[in-house]
Amino acid sequence: MADDWDTVTKIGSRVGGGGGGGPRLTTIKNKSQLNAAQRAGGIVGTEKKYGTANSSRSEAGSGQFLTKVDRSDDIVKPKTGDKELGMYIMQNREQKKLGNRLEFGKKVGINEKDLARIEKGEVPITQDQVNRIERGLEMFIRGVKKGEPKVKTFKRAADKK
C-alpha cells in the first residue's frame, strides 16, 4: 500500500511513452542526426530510398521490362519508333528546305542526335517532340489532319465580342 503513495497516476490521452516498448523509428534527414544516433547506440539502418519520378526512362522501366521478358516464352522486342513517320518528317524537312538536321533541330529545340534517331525510327517519339516538329514544319505529321498545313489562328479582342 505504501507503493501507491509514491507513484503518480497520470490521466489523459497524451500520457505515457507510447506503445510497443521499443525505440521509435524516425527518419534521419542529415548527417548530424545520423552521427547523434550512432553515438547514442541506437540501431541505425542506412538505406537509400530510390524514387523513379525524376530518373530516366531506361532506368525506371527496366525492371518492369525485364519481368515482362522473363514471363514470356517468345521474343519480346523493345519499343521502337515509327519508320514511316521518320521518313515523312525527313522528306518534308528536305522538301521545304528547312536545312539539315542540325539547323532544323536548333529551330525546333530538339537535339540533332535525337532528331536523327526519330527519323530513322529507332526510338518512339514523344508528344512534346511531335508538337515541336509540327511547329517547325508548319504542318500536321500525325492523325486525321496528316499533311495539312498547321496555320496559327489569332482572334482579336474585337472579334471575340
Curated annotation (Swiss-Prot):
Pfam families: MBF1. Signal peptide: none annotated. Residues 27-36, 52-65 have a biased composition (Polar residues). Residues 1-66 are annotated as: Disordered. Gene3D superfamilies: lambda repressor-like DNA-binding domains. GO terms for molecular function: DNA binding. Keywords: Activator, DNA-binding, Transcription, Transcription regulation. GO terms for cellular component: nucleus. CDD domains: HTH_XRE. It comes from the Eukaryota. Residues 14-23 have a biased composition (Gly residues). Residues 90-144 form the HTH cro/C1-type domain. InterPro entries: Cro/C1-type_HTH, Lambda_DNA-bd_dom_sf, MBF1_N. Residues 101-120 bind DNA. The keyword Kinase does not apply. Belongs to the MBF1 family. Transcriptional coactivator that stimulates GCN4-dependent transcriptional activity by bridging the DNA-binding region of GCN4 and TBP (SPT15), thereby recruiting TBP to GCN4-bound promoters. Involved in induction of the ribosome quality control (RQC) pathway; a pathway that degrades nascent peptide chains during problematic translation. Required to prevent stalled ribosomes from frameshifting. This is Multiprotein-bridging factor 1. The gene is MBF1.
